[in-house]
A protein has these predicted regions:
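Catalytic-domain carbohydrate-binding cleft regions of carbohydrate-active enzymes
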Residues: 1-203
Length: 203
């Protein structure tokens, strides 16, 4: 009675997909492309079914970010440019994953859904593959190299965030995003929790 009436007003609650109830592989480790596939093969050889393959933050430039992008060497380890913190990233680490599209296809062939770790709090920095497109979408001058701030309260940012940073990777084979906590509890909109908002928009 009461619950049915509530659903008539609110609609039925979404159900988690069946694959989410299976076995996930998740480990904070800097896998290589071949190494990750060998790992999945070991599970398959032992007849241990996996439904979700997780790649932690080393899918993008992380531990070697400063060295590879020469951030400090170029004098760009400043707040203006976004520093050299490796938590946030959107460009694949090609040292570890030289052909990420093939990696995603190979994982799919093993029957796994794919999720990538995400820490968006540092925004989009000058060295990211998507920086120019993000700057253009938000009316910013990309020639300055200024960090594009993460702003979950701004509609234009949210639209560009999904269209430019995430949807292309989803077309390549990423199924969903593991939103790791890093954004704090406040945004430019009073009372809006960034993590709650990210969960809402991504879901």
């Amino acid at each position: 009675g009461a619950v049915k009436a509530l659903y008539m007003i609110t609609g039925a609650p979404p159900l988690v997909p069946r694959f989410a109830l299976g076995n996930w592989w998740s480990r904070y480790y800097a896998y290589t492309q071949d190494g990750y596939l060998r790992l999945l093969q070991r599970f398959e050889d032992r007849k241990i079914p996996l439904t979700v393959a997780t790649l932690d933050m080393d899918w993008h430039w992380s531990k070697t970010l400063d060295e590879v992008k020469k951030i400090t060497e170029l004098g760009r380890n400043t707040e203006f440019y976004g520093g050299n913190n490796g938590w946030t990233g959107y460009s694949w680490n090609t040292d570890l994953f030289p052909d990420y599209k093939k990696l995603l296809r190979d994982i799919k062939e093993k029957g796994c859904k794919i999720t990538l770790n995400l820490h968006p709090a540092d925004g989009v920095r000058w060295f990211e593959n998507q920086y120019n497109d993000m700057a253009n979408a938000l009316g910013k001058d990309s020639s300055t190299g200024e960090r594009i701030a993460f702003d979950i309260a701004d509609d234009d940012f949210i639209n560009a965030y999904f269209k430019i940073l995430h949807k292309p990777y989803e077309k390549d084979g990423v199924d969903f995003w593991w939103i790791d906590w890093q954004q704090g509890e406040k945004s430019d909109l009073d009372g809006l929790d960034p993590l709650w908002s990210l969960n809402h928009y991504h879901y």
